[in-house]
Amino acid sequence: MFMRTDDTGALARQPSGKPVRNSGDRFRPQGTEASKWKQRAFSVVKGFTTPLLPEDFIDLVDPLKTSTILRGRVQQIVRETEDAITVVIQPGRTWKGHKPGQYTRIGVDINGIRLWRAYSITSGPRTDGLIAVTVKALTGGAVSTYLHEHLREGQIVQMEQAEGDFVLPDNLDKPVLLLTGGSGITPAMGILRHTVGAQQDLDVVMLHSAPRPEDVIFATELHDLAQQGRLTLLERHTDTHGMLDPVELDSLVPDWRERQTFACGPAGMLEMLEEHWEREGRRDQLIVEQFRPKLVEPGEGGTVHFTEIDKELECDGARPILDIGEEAGVLMPSGCRMGICYGCVLPMREGAVRDLRTGEVTQALEGDNVLVQTCISAAAGKCEIVL
């Protein structure tokens, strides 16, 4: 239910006699006859809609115009590869824009549960205000599977403001190297399209890894840019040549040490790159974005007890507590779902969890209240989570 902040409709007064307005007020400052008439008209409408506000009815008619919740309307769905689609979205009026390389979180309702996932914004500069995200279908991925199989043009999705530090520095004075693998190409494509659209004279080399040529997302556009001389493109097909070994960069990109490098892809690839740049003493020239946590062998699992709502779930050792909880209808805080933002952190009063990225086990004795990231933690025995 929606409720007004002031059921009497009266406004508090400052010592000067002027109304005090809070964030819930929908009025403009008084001063002209026109604004007074608007205020009176609004008050009349407000009387008819109580206890809702007029804006709540606007939300029903046009959900993109609400000032309280950010949503987007799907304008177009484009098939990129067999398992990748690009979704073009018209964000609501409260969208604050984004920097190339950032991501937005998209929320959809699946079986009565709202699930969120982070997707990189892949569109370049546009005059129509639309943005695009590119989604690769993941085996067992609830949201990516839903978007591929059920999303339709015209559908409304939940959104959050853009986030992320995988962006070009404002004062960049070096040539650029983009090292990407699989769907890790998506934030790099957002950067690349921006530099091309803005007519920036930037020396860019992209080395992209994918299993086969037909698995390369944006392949046609990348090849066109390479033919135009806007990009030096190197493709590595891992089914044939295996994963990239960083030592190969000396022959593939001889001047890589002079370039600012942006890397995004599987965790194993990023770990090797970080170690290589560290050994070379150039770690500050490498910016990484991990789009999917690296999982280790499943543990034994256990019973998770959410103490405040008194609900117990049997959790295996292969999946995050967050995912299992949401599927069971438990409303849990969440964020990036990659172990980066700490938006999912909850206190563990007692028990043990295993970090799915590293295999490290975190334990809590009775009453400890150890903070755990539920998006990358699996049950490693019985545990109690304060929620």
Name the predicted role of every residue range.
Residues 57-156, 160, 173-175, 202-203, ...:
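Ferredoxin-reductase
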Residues 1-29, 36, 145-310, 314:
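FNR/FR-type flavoprotein reductase catalytic core
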Residues 1-84:
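Short, low-complexity N-terminal leaders and the immediately following helix N-cap/first helix
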Residues 239, 316, 377-387:
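Short flanking/linker segments adjacent to small metal-binding domains or redox-active Cys/His motifs
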